[in-house]
Amino acid sequence: MSLLLEPSAAMIKEQKLYREMGLTDEEFARIEAILGRLPNYTETGIFAVMWSEHCSYKNSKPVLKKFPTDGPHVLQGPGEGAGIVDIGDGLAVAFKIESHNHPSAIEPYQGAATGVGGIIRDVFSMGARPIALLNSLRFGELTSPRVKYLFEQVVAGIAGYGNCVGIPTVGGEVQFDPAYEGNPLVNAMCVGIIRHEDIQRGVATGVGNTVMYVGAKTGRDGIHGATFASEELSEQSEAKRPAVQVGDPFMEKLLLEACLEAVKSDALVGIQDMGAAGLTSSSAEMASKGGFGIEMNLDLVPQREAGMTPYEMMLSESQERMLLVVKQGCEDEIAAIFAKYGLEAKAIGKVTDDKMLRLLFRGEVAAEIPVDALAKDAPVYHKPSAEPAYYREFQAMPPYTPHIEDYNQTLLGLLAQPTIASKEWVYDQYDYMVRTNTVVAPGSDAAVVRIRGMNKALALTTDCNSRYLYLDPETGGKIAVAEAARNVICSGAKPLAITDCLNFGSPEKPEIFWQLEKAVDGMSEACRALGTPVVSGNVSLYNETNGEAVYPTPVVGMVGLIDDLSHITTQSFKQAGDLIYVIGEAKPEFGGSELQKWLEGRIFGKAPEIDLEVEASRQRQLLAAIRAGVVASAHDIAEGGLAVALAECVMGASGLGAKVTIGGDLVSELFSETQSRFVISVKKEHQEAFEQLVEAKRIGEVTGDGILTVNGEQGETVIRLSVDEMRNVWKGAIPCLLKSKD
């Protein structure tokens, strides 16, 4: 497209062309006031992407301020490529989760693949070596051909990119609900290890220092991707396929190694991934954070396609690109590092003292904008919020009481639900053992990755039960954080901090904004109670299809530290004769439960309650017992209740079964999703020591007969199922649904 074909500044205003880029009339007037003139086409595009929700968080910023972000171990909180937490011995862990929802709905393979690529770059831009990937996925019901296609392609995209770049995908979660039918959620998390002295930041400082472009050449892919991510999906979204980028994991691997070598050089001042809004966001954000300006000559930008305009170059979201600021005179040193990996590092500009983003093209100024107007001074909106009518209706409902006649069939039915069923079909496509540091592979409560050369490991998990959040966003927000911590504790780790990905509908709707506010309130309270500050994150709003929003889904990514490899614990029972305990009492809480969804085909009523003091106390007790060496296995009780938790504990163990006795209301005891509960197994010789450390109730013991037997108080058999039968149902559910032709 030639510059001559671009609309003039006057046309942009008169024909309100800025609206097509996502700017409102008020925002355009504000831009006019900032510049003291009408913006040209390139400048309008730059403002549009930088002021999109995706880049500016203009609708969510006031809510995000509620999160606790400080803690004794926090080295870098929100605002950089990734959060960083100290893990002792001069080492730290860098991690972040991000969404790639809209691109994955349109082009699922590349959408998911480039989501993985982007989050890896965020982590190594901090100077950290990525050691693990996780993902949190949401789809509609697996009975629909389109959902099957999206599911298969998203998983293939994640596997294709992660496996090629050589970083193990060690964990995550997949849930299926009709609310995600048209708008799947694809959240990717990356975790890296870094020495304290290698920590880098995305800043541009030092007048005269050189701005260098490294990595892949710029093409026309992904233009306005950030704006696309800030609007609802509709029938017309399919036409926006060009806004989805294409990834090259082999280029990423070279870029990763070159950048990690460059960060060790004193020549490097700052480094940032060209992510959403590409060259625009990386340059404007680095300059604004550093308190300087940047001038770039766009004729020098490496281009993949002929005749690209400043607008296209600045808004392209071509993958595998980084922007560096290098000390003046040291350009050759940095270029030599990248050349070693077959990559070009090209000087395209310099740091200035006037706090302006100035773009030159063919000898003329193509754009000139104050950097702070694009970054820290972007508009912030305080949206109205209103309690939804459905919430009041759910709160007023009497407690839901399920009726069960056949407990065996109920347990088998729950094990076949895709949200509970084995995700082996998914993680078998991931190389989760590459780099050989994975100690606990996918399928347990949390993945565990050891830190090479040390007697320490990291426990990693992603969690969020969005059904609870739909019923009650504040309670559901607390539960999301608490469950992540439970999973980390069950692995023998102390929870350190979280990263979050807030996936919600349109903030323009007061009921949706209320969900966001309440969820963040609940998460913040739980983070304070459990001592896990928020160190990084991402907001993804406008997750709607034809006006229907997804469930509120604030995914929590948590990292915990195992300070001695002997403390690593898994959920599978270990040997016959071990005693089985339950921590926590069951109440009749079935709102939003797997049982309610299976029996009624929908969810309603009140979410389970949670007492954060009780939660914190039980977690402390269990971790102390694990560290004392008196716990053989630990598993949190979540979807499907105690019955499903027991099944999972025996299905992971070869040839073992369990025999337990349950009193009280059997439906509640077995299937309620009451919070803050665990199933533990303990060797007989550790019984006394365990009971002194933990308040728990002994319910039975591990057997060697390969059968799960649950008896009532009167000795009657309530459940008797062979572990093989349960395992076949549990493992076969997802492959069976994918093969069925409906």
From Swiss-Prot:
Pathway: Purine metabolism; IMP biosynthesis via de novo pathway; 5-amino-1-(5-phospho-D-ribosyl)imidazole from N(2)-formyl-N(1)-(5-phospho-D-ribosyl)glycinamide: step 1/2. One of its GO terms (biological process) is 'de novo' IMP biosynthetic process. GO terms for molecular function: ATP binding; magnesium ion binding; phosphoribosylformylglycinamidine synthase activity. InterPro entries: PRibForGlyAmidine_synth_PurL (IPR010074), PurL_linker (IPR041609), PurM-like_C_dom (IPR010918), PurM-like_C_sf (IPR036676), PurM-like_N (IPR016188), PurM-like_N_sf (IPR036921). It catalyses: N(2)-formyl-N(1)-(5-phospho-beta-D-ribosyl)glycinamide + L-glutamine + ATP + H2O = 2-formamido-N(1)-(5-O-phospho-beta-D-ribosyl)acetamidine + L-glutamate + ADP + phosphate + H(+). NCBIfam families: FGAM_synth_II, PRK01213.1. This is Phosphoribosylformylglycinamidine synthase subunit PurL.
